[in-house]
Amino acid sequence: MEKLQNRILQEGHALSETVLKVDSFLNHQVDPDLMYEIGTYFKNYFKEHKITKVFTIESSGIAPAVMTAMQMNLPMVILKKQASKILNGDVYQTTVHSFTKGLDYELTLSKKYIAKEDNILIIDDFLANGEAALGAARLVKEAGAKVAGMGIVIEKSFQPGRKMLEDKGYDVYSLARIAKLQKGLIEFVK
């Protein structure tokens, strides 16, 4: 997605060889027009996949996921990273390691928001090592439902996430694929 790549080049900051800061339009301040366009790209790519729900992991995946769900006229479910007292234990849970934060968390899905016949589209802001996406997929599989695909806003292609997901048979569609990060340098996959 050329517009997204341009925004990354104009406003993104490569803080290191693995960390890209895009907080001016994606994960702190959000550009709703850009998120709408991102939703359009995901809707168009996954339109033949018979999606029944859009899932995302709190919190930075929410904006692109809600725009995708809105355009597909589907419900969106937010997978929780922290235990909630209102879920009352009627949940699916899996442990996920956060690459960004360097810690483990319990990814949680209420059983009432997924059915065996669901065909789930997982949307996330970043793909690096693939741990978050795999965790979301584990919850979907535990419920007996199917992962129809994974929509990623920004993929760090130099990390193993895509290969791990594709090796497990998932259809991964990324809007911006980064080949290399260095302090002050961002290069895309050609």
UniProtKB/Swiss-Prot annotation:
Its EC number is 2.4.2.22. 5-phospho-alpha-D-ribose 1-diphosphate binds at residues 128-132. It catalyses: XMP + diphosphate = xanthine + 5-phospho-alpha-D-ribose 1-diphosphate. GO terms for cellular component: cytoplasm. Pathway: Purine metabolism; XMP biosynthesis via salvage pathway; XMP from xanthine: step 1/1. SUPFAM superfamilies: PRTase-like. Its main location: cytoplasm. It is an enzyme of class 2 (transferase). One of its GO terms (biological process) is XMP salvage. Pfam families: Pribosyltran. Xanthine binds at residues 20, 27, 156. GO terms for molecular function: xanthine phosphoribosyltransferase activity. Keywords: Cytoplasm, Glycosyltransferase, Purine salvage, Transferase. CDD domains: PRTases_typeI. Converts the preformed base xanthine, a product of nucleic acid breakdown, to xanthosine 5'-monophosphate (XMP), so it can be reused for RNA or DNA synthesis. Belongs to the purine/pyrimidine phosphoribosyltransferase family. Xpt subfamily. Homodimer. HAMAP family: XPRTase. This is Xanthine phosphoribosyltransferase 1. It comes from Clostridium botulinum (strain Hall / ATCC 3502 / NCTC 13319 / Type A).
